[in-house]
Amino acid sequence: MNRRALMGAAATAPVALATPAIAQSLPEVRWRAASSFPRVFDILYGTLEKISARVAQLTDNKFRIQTFPAGEIVGGLQVLDAVQGGNVEAGHTASYYYIGKDISFVPFTAMTFGLNTRQLTAWFRHGGGNELANELFRDYSIVAHTAGDTGAQMGGWFRNEVQSLDQLRGLKFRITGLAGQLFQRLGAAPTLIAPADIYPALERGVIDATEFVGPHDDLRANYVRVARYYYAPGFWEPGARLHFMMNQRAHAALPDQYKYAIEVACSEADAEMVSRYDASNPQALRRLVAAGAQLRFWPRPIMEAAWKANEELNADLARQNPRFAKILELSLIHI
């Protein structure tokens, strides 16, 4: 079904499913869906709740998806594995968390100096991005829809100012995706930590710095209490797209109406998430500054070194992984 027809289905589904004969013919289905994010991140975890509620609404409550925050069923970085293995039918996560399986997962969330939110939307909806993503996901017995974007992100929280490349050397930095490999080339010591575990790691000195999303989430996480230097921009995430992943067998067993309901709910989530961040981030940033955050911009020498290192990194990885090379080439057309 094309997107125009799909959105038409969204408009008519509640009316159609109100017809008793149709409603009675639909089966009762119960799924479980795991999130990579704890409840404290209300937009991130809340997006999964909104998807669940919308699916229920569009199916006359015949199809119910019970949602679980990170840690209740599986850890935040194990969502893909749980969906693939059928431990849960679905999950809401960022594909770049699974870089250890295949670097080709990374461009479907964010690339350093890559696509912003609008460009990601253009690529996924009109440039073959969805098809490329699901080619990869099929290798893991998963079907997925894009389901939210954070918008441009901040550059993270640091215990000390970073004014030169020398000050990056040995810096224990929580960072995701290929940006970790980039900062490693710049001398830092990157590590990937699940969102729920970032604050205690920063508080105990296990890490010296962290990036996450932006003001709204950073205020809720209270990172300003343990690291006051707040950097911009998050040049490794001009936009960051999330996915609603489904076990392939569980998805195949659904009636078409339920598949359409999921697609509609995810399409709405794509637009809703970034608008919520755009509405909340300005006030959250003011509150962070009032709480003691010291805003800083990356020094030009670091930005220039990062650009050079990123070009070299992408070239190296493209030579090693033909699938990554293809995905990268087809995505960058949209910049």
List each language-model region with its residue ranges.
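N-terminal secretory/targeting leader peptides
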Residues: 2-17, 22-120, 128-333
